[in-house]
């Protein structure tokens, strides 16, 4: 119980910092939203995905891109706390050591939820529609939370070990780029063989395919198990 209480206090501290500068949440949501608008209104007409509205195909990948962008801020916040000596100060106090990290992790989850909601609202305005029911939406939420949790624990590593702010955030760049080499924007069968092999065997593709299947009542096959395995595996390794 003490660990939970300590975590809730430190989570509240991190959330208050974010609420004082909500522009960080908005900024992280705006960049993926701008990419979504560009692909839908500039490139969407030239991309054949088998859907009536390209935003329906695109949305899962945009959400994953937003999550990857957002966790860079988690690494930066951790780095800032380390540089200011707050970690050492917390560890000298009678609080659970794990609660310091869990406070940041929970803040990442909540702030990502806010960003995702903003993105979905914009997608609805430009034509996104889903046939998913409550169970499917809850399943999508669960997968996104698990993916966010996995990447957040990855972000903890550079946050604690980086030598500069740029170093703390730089790890997220490859993660942001991964959706571009996946099924997030175009079907993988349109890609050259070497690229297709990579795209079909990296985590974003299985997660995107799972979310897309849940949102539009399409067959998922083994994608959901592969997606869960990736998320759990990344979390355990991190």
Locations of regions flagged by a protein language model:
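Hydrophobic alpha-helical transmembrane segments of multi-pass membrane transport proteins
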Residues: 34-39, 55-126, 171-174, 179
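Aromatic- and glycine-rich beta-strand/loop motifs that create alpha-glucan
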Residues: 1-31
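Membrane-interfacial helix-loop-helix junctions in multi-pass membrane proteins
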Residues: 17, 48-49, 182-236
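Alpha-helical transmembrane segments and their short interhelical loops
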Residues: 97-172, 219-238
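Short, membrane-interfacial amphipathic segments enriched in basic
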Residues: 1-11, 151, 194-205
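Residues that define the loop-to-transmembrane-helix transition and helix capping
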Residues: 22-23, 56, 98, 166, ...
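Transmembrane helix-loop junctions in multipass membrane proteins, especially transporters and channels
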Residues: 40-49, 78, 85, 120, ...
């Amino acid at each position: 119980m003490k660990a939970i209480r300590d975590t809730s206090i430190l989570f509240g501290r991190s959330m208050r910092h974010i609420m004082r500068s909500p522009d960080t949440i908005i900024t992280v949501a705006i960049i993926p939203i701008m990419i979504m608008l560009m692909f839908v209104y500039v490139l969407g007409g030239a991309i054949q995905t088998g859907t009536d509205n390209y935003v329906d195909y695109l949305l899962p990948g945009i959400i994953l891109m937003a999550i990857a962008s957002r966790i860079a801020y988690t690494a930066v916040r951790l780095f800032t706390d380390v540089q200011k000596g707050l970690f050492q100060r917390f560890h000298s106090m009678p609080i659970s050591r794990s609660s310091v990290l869990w406070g940041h992790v929970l803040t990442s989850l909540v702030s990502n939820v806010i960003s995702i909601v903003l993105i979905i609202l914009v997608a609805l305005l430009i034509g996104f529609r889903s046939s998913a029911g409550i169970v499917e939406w809850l399943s999508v939420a669960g997968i996104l939370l698990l993916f966010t949790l996995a990447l957040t624990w990855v972000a903890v590593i550079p946050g604690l070990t980086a030598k500069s702010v740029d170093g703390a955030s730089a790890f997220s760049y490859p993660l942001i780029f991964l959706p571009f080499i996946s099924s997030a924007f175009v079907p993988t069968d349109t890609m050259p063989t070497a690229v297709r092999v990579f795209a079909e065997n990296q985590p974003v593709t299985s997660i995107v395919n799972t979310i897309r299947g849940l949102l539009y009542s399409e067959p998922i096959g083994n994608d959901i198990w592969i997606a869960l395995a990736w998320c759990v595996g990344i979390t355990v390794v991190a």
